[in-house]
């Protein structure tokens, strides 16, 4: 069957849900597709369709990022449902990097929890520019004053991570009430909070200025082979434009970049002549074996970005209250560094005269990776150890 062409008639925005486990991120995502489905601009995806990876069902928690798409009257959205559980912060780091704005889901019954804080911190570190709050499960709280208190707490938390807490839109509602309603009228009261939320998302999150005029780069998230056609690399175009027939380089996780040609581009299972910054795509690559390319590398315009192993980074070390280390670390500390979609072990050199680095410190340090990563100044990374985030930073200077 021939694939339909993807129509680019509305501005495209990438958003996602973040927040503590069981506060209702996936239910809210399902409710948005249900309500916008009444306008004919979304396909309703039930909770268990979004929560779809096999290992998720047994635990009832979301592990991988799920992508859904929908439209409002003014925009086309790609929505990622980000993992909420602390074990899966690793995926949050790769998922949150794909957001022009985020919907922070907070249960009105529980208020902000440890992962609420962690996700706000991560959003700040990976550069999610806007956060809107959906205060979920309001049907479970009878006392308005309690909801007011939760709202104040959330605003303070946002402000403490440099988001404009006082001006952040907060919508109260219940995703479950919207999901359980049998009404097909979008004006039903149980759908009002979802309608109000999407209106705020339309208005508060600006249409991103896409970096389309910059050199093409796409971090590789996944790779698979299509029999008879070749190898496809999937990911979100970070900058620039890629056209069918363009020469690109595979950069990172190896000494020298490899050249190839993009022979096909598709998005949401539809073929495109070209893809631009912000698009989640699959790129078909000429003459590339399934084993020649892997998650953590990037596709880039030839010569535009180089692989490096040694750099200076500005680093913030999390406190134990933020889920970080309880103890300091010293010169020669070897954690994992998460860049874009993968982790690489590196060795830390702390500045002369500094004996150790304490939780809560903000420090400039040199980092030597064991494998090269496609790198430019300003690139963000997270520092991880034993499955948890212990620091965050960005590349301030490339040494070699």
From Swiss-Prot:
tr-type G domain: from which residue to which, for each copy? Answer: 10-209
Residue sites binding Mg(2+) per the record: 26
Q: Which PROSITE patterns match?
A: G_TR_1, G_TR_2
Assigned EC number = 3.6.5.3
- Give the region (G5) as residue ranges: 174-176
Residues spanning the signal sequence: none
Residue ranges, annotated region (G2): 60-64
Known catalysed reaction(s)?
GTP + H2O = GDP + phosphate + H(+)
Q: Where do the segments described as G4 lie?
A: 136-139
Q: Do you know which Pfam families this protein is assigned to?
A: GTP_EFTU, GTP_EFTU_D2, GTP_EFTU_D3
GO terms for MF: GTP binding; GTPase activity; translation elongation factor activity
Top-level taxon: Bacteria
The positions annotated for binding GTP are: 19-26, 81-85, 136-139
CDD domains hit by this protein:
EF_Tu, EFTU_II, EFTU_III
List GO terms (cellular component aspect): cytosol
Q: Which InterPro entries match?
A: EF-Tu_GTP-bd (IPR041709), EF-Tu_GTPase (IPR050055), EFTu-like_2 (IPR004161), EFTU_2 (IPR033720), G_TR_CS (IPR031157), P-loop_NTPase (IPR027417), Small_GTP-bd (IPR005225), T_Tr_GTP-bd_dom (IPR000795)
The record ties this protein, via SUPFAM superfamilies, to: EF-Tu/eEF-1alpha/eIF2-gamma C-terminal domain (SSF50465), P-loop containing nucleoside triphosphate hydrolases (SSF52540), Translation proteins (SSF50447)
The alphabetical list of record keywords is: Cytoplasm, Elongation factor, GTP-binding, Hydrolase, Magnesium, Metal-binding, Nucleotide-binding, Protein biosynthesis
Indicate the enzyme's highest-level EC class: hydrolase
Please name the NCBIfam families in this protein's record.
Answer: EF-Tu, PRK00049.1, PRK12735.1, PRK12736.1, small_GTP
User: How is the quaternary structure described?
Assistant: Monomer.
Described function: GTP hydrolase that promotes the GTP-dependent binding of aminoacyl-tRNA to the A-site of ribosomes during protein biosynthesis.
Protein name, as recorded: Elongation factor Tu
What is the native source organism of this protein? Ruminiclostridium cellulolyticum (strain ATCC 35319 / DSM 5812 / JCM 6584 / H10) (Clostridium cellulolyticum)
Quote the gene name from the UniProt entry.
Answer: tuf
């Amino acid at each position: 069957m021939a694939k339909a062409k993807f129509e680019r008639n509305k501005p495209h925005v990438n958003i996602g849900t973040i927040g503590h486990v069981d506060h209702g991120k996936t239910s809210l995502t399902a409710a948005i597709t249900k309500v916008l489905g009444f306008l004919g601009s979304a396909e309703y995806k039930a909770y268990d369709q979004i929560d779809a990876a096999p290992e998720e069902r047994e635990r009832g928690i979301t592990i991988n990022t799920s992508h859904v798409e929908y439209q409002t009257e003014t925009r086309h959205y790609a929505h990622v449902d980000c993992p909420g559980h602390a074990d899966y912060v690793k995926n949050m780091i790769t998922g949150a990097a794909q957001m022009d704005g985020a919907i922070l889901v907070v249960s009105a019954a529980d208020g902000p929890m440890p992962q609420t804080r962690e996700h706000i911190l991560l959003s700040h570190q990976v550069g999610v520019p806007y956060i809107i709050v959906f205060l979920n499960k309001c049907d479970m709280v009878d006392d308005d004053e309690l909801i007011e208190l939760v709202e104040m707490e959330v605003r303070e938390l946002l402000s403490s991570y440099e988001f404009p807490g006082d001006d952040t839109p907060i919508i109260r509602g219940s995703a479950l009430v919207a999901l359980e309603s049998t009404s097909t009228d979008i004006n039903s009261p149980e759908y009002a909070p979802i309608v109000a939320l999407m209106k705020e998302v339309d208005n508060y999150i600006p249409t991103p200025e896409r970096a389309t005029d910059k050199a093409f780069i796409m971090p590789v998230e996944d790779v698979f082979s299509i029999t008879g056609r070749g190898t496809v690399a999937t990911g979100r175009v970070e900058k620039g434009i890629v056209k069918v027939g363009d020469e690109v380089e595979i950069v990172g996780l190896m000494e020298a970049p490899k050249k190839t040609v993009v022979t096909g581009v598709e998005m949401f299972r539809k073929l495109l002549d070209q893809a631009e910054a912000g698009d989640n795509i699959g790129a078909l690559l000429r003459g590339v074996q399934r084993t020649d390319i892997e998650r953590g590398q990037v596709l880039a315009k030839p010569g535009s970005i180089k692989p490096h192993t040694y750099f200076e980074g500005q680093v913030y070390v999390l406190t134990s209250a933020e889920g970080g280390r309880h103890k300091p670390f010293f010169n020669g500390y070897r954690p994992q560094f998460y860049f874009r979609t993968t982790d690489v072990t590196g060795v830390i050199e702390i500045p002369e005269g500094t004996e150790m680095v304490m939780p809560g410190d903000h420090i400039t340090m040199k980092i030597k990776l064991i494998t090269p990563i496609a790198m430019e100044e300003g690139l963000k990374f997270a520092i991880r150890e034993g499955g948890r985030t212990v620091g965050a930073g960005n590349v301030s200077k490339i040494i070699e």
